[in-house]
Amino acid sequence: MPQHQNYSLSEEDVIQLVFRKYGVKITSEQIVRAYAPEQKMSWKKSVEVARFIKGMTLRQAKSWLEDVVKMKRPIPIKTFKKKQAHHAVPWSGWPVAKWPVKVAKRFLDLLENLENNAKFRGLDVERVVIVHAAAHKGYRIPNIMPRAFGRATRFDEQTVNVEVIAAELPKEVVPKRYKLNLVKR
């Protein structure tokens, strides 16, 4: 397995991203990263979870994902929703929602790592906001499934490279509550 850490955003890119989105200037000492290479989980579900936690504080993301593991709150599915069951989700604007438990557990481990990195750097964990989260396809592990009459079918096991970048922001721009479209039908 490759041990290199390929972040898709440099520190300058993160500083510009925070300035464009929140209107504050930060330094490179206020940025923390966590990277989990070659995780054996669904890439499509990882993309949806990464998209969902972007913009949340670290505490908000951890509490939401803990509820996903307990099957109390779902993750909205925005992109990969064709031929999916459209459950009667009680929130408008979410035609499809899922409970990706395995992916949520892996993201919780990654957010725990991110929180420890923030504490190590001396940042206030209550003001750490996730500014970038991404899931990229990793390498595929080839496998063979034996079939009847001496045949075999090849199938590949997918891996995912997950990265989360967060920044410590001033108190006035930290989101108090994550805004969701939670209007009851």
Curated annotation (Swiss-Prot):
SUPFAM superfamilies the UniProt entry points to: Ribosomal protein L22 (SSF54843)
GO molecular function, one term: rRNA binding
Function: This protein binds specifically to 23S rRNA. It makes multiple contacts with different domains of the 23S rRNA in the assembled 50S subunit and ribosome. The globular domain of the protein is located near the polypeptide exit tunnel on the outside of the subunit, while an extended beta-hairpin is found that lines the wall of the exit tunnel in the center of the 70S ribosome.
Quaternary state and interactors: Part of the 50S ribosomal subunit.
Gene Ontology biological process: cytoplasmic translation
Entry annotated with the keyword Magnesium: no
Family annotation (Pfam families): Ribosomal_L22
Signal peptide start and end residues: none
Membrane-spanning residues: none
InterPro entries: Ribosomal_uL22, Ribosomal_uL22_euk/arc, Ribosomal_uL22_sf
Keywords: Ribonucleoprotein, Ribosomal protein, RNA-binding, rRNA-binding
Similarity annotation: Belongs to the universal ribosomal protein uL22 family.
Name of the protein: Large ribosomal subunit protein uL22
